[in-house]
């Protein structure tokens, strides 16, 4: 939810369906702060993107997937695809463009996509230091 009458140029009650994550806040705030504000070079690079295009009703141009791990859930969101695993169970795949409520698991129909997304998730988990918690099921 965002409220900024002077900076958000969309119709009243506009809802953006663009996925975003906490990692997008710093790039967004830095862009809003304007020129002269730069991210410190001694810190790790930012994975997020600025959300400001959504303030004008535009789509985001996200190149990297979004990764989450919380409360025993492992999640990768890549465009319309969402790969989900709960507490070491089998991975589930959903097409959010067609199934926003995640009722139709498509993992059996798209095994190659599932394998590719699991590899991406495991690579991310190892990179950030949670590699020992990665799933063996479905890989």
Which stretches of residues belong to each language-model region?
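Intrinsically disordered, low-complexity polar regions and short flexible loop motifs
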Residues: 99
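C-terminal cap/loop subdomain of S1 sulfatases and analogous C-terminal strand-loop tails that border
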Residues: 7-14, 18-96, 124-139
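Glycine/Thr-rich phosphate-binding loops that ligate phosphate moieties of nucleotide
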Residues: 114
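Basic, alpha-helical interaction scaffolds
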Residues: 119
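Active-site-proximal N-terminal segment of extracellular/periplasmic enzymes that hydrolyze or transfer
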Residues: 104-111
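Short glycine- and hydrophobic/aromatic-rich loop-to-beta-strand nucleating segment
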Residues: 1-3
């Amino acid at each position: 939810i965002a409220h900024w009458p002077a900076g958000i140029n969309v119709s009243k009650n506009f809802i953006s369906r663009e996925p975003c994550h906490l990692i997008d806040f710093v790039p967004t705030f830095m862009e809003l702060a304007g020129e002269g504000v730069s991210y410190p070079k001694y810190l790790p690079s930012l994975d997020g993107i600025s959300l400001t295009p959504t303030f004008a009703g535009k789509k985001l141009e996200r190149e990297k997937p979004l990764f989450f791990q919380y409360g025993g859930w492992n999640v990768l969101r890549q465009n319309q695809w969402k790969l989900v695993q709960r507490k070491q169970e089998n991975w589930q795949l959903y097409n959010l463009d067609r199934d926003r409520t995640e009722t139709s698991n498509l993992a059996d129909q798209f095994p190659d996509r599932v394998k590719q997304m699991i590899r991406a998730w495991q690579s991310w988990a190892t990179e950030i230091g949670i590699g020992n918690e990665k799933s063996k099921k479905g890989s």
